[in-house]
């Protein structure tokens, strides 16, 4: 089974309506989950009541993202696949062929996650063709605060700090043991180390060239 998942607080309901219309044109998804704050559990809303504020950045720095994904994964079967997209994304029907390629890829791989970086496809393990478009420079040292680098013990790992961030707004997941483990770890960090996704200043020094924290995406990347 193939699913689409997105979330927006009630101020952005028009984005979810638009996304729903676009998704239905694909005639591909077995079920479409378009969620808002009313779909969050009472316990989650109580835990993050000081952050889940309408109009705030990412409705609480996107802390709800692994929460809703884990909730959906608890509903679906092993081997089922989902596409998560931020509500601001558009589903382009002219890209349906590529989307089907992604779903075909994830069904065949063991780790259960396909995520995206601003780099050309690796010809050694991908048949996807690069169309030549200019790619953004989103190196980790610019967008991940020092405290987060220290938490993951990668401050001195140039391979990591000079890599491109992994997009937190679009990814595919196949329900399997490995993907569940990753989402639960993402979820746990938000529950226990909320400062890593917030805009609070880093206690430890940021790396030279740091611009600003990329919130949930920084955790997802590392």
Task: Put a short name on every predicted segment.
Residues 1-222:
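Glycosyltransferase catalytic domains, chiefly GT-A lineage
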């Amino acid at each position: 089974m193939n699913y689409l998942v997105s979330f927006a607080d009630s101020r952005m309901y028009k984005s979810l309506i638009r996304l729903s219309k676009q998704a239905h044109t694909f005639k591909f998804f077995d079920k479409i989950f378009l969620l808002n704050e009313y779909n969050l559990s009472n316990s989650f809303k109580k835990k993050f009541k000081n952050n889940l504020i309408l109009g705030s950045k990412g409705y609480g720095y996107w802390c709800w993202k692994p929460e809703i994904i884990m909730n959906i994964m608890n509903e679906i079967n092993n081997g089922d696949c989902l596409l998560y997209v931020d509500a601001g994304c558009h589903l382009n029907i002219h890209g349906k062929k590529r989307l089907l390629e992604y779903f075909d890829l994830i069904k065949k791989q063991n780790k259960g996650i396909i995520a995206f970086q601003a780099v050309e496809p690796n010809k050694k393990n991908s048949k996807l063709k690069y169309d030549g478009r200019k790619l953004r420079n989103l190196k980790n040292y610019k967008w991940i605060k020092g405290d987060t680098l220290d938490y993951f013990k990668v401050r001195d790992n140039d391979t990591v700090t000079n890599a491109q961030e992994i997009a937190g707004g679009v990814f595919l997941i196949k329900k399997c043991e490995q993907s569940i483990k990753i989402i639960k770890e993402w979820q746990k960090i938000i529950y226990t180390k909320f400062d890593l996704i917030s805009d609070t200043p880093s206690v430890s020094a940021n790396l030279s060239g740091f611009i600003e924290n990329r919130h949930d995406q920084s955790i997802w990347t590392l």
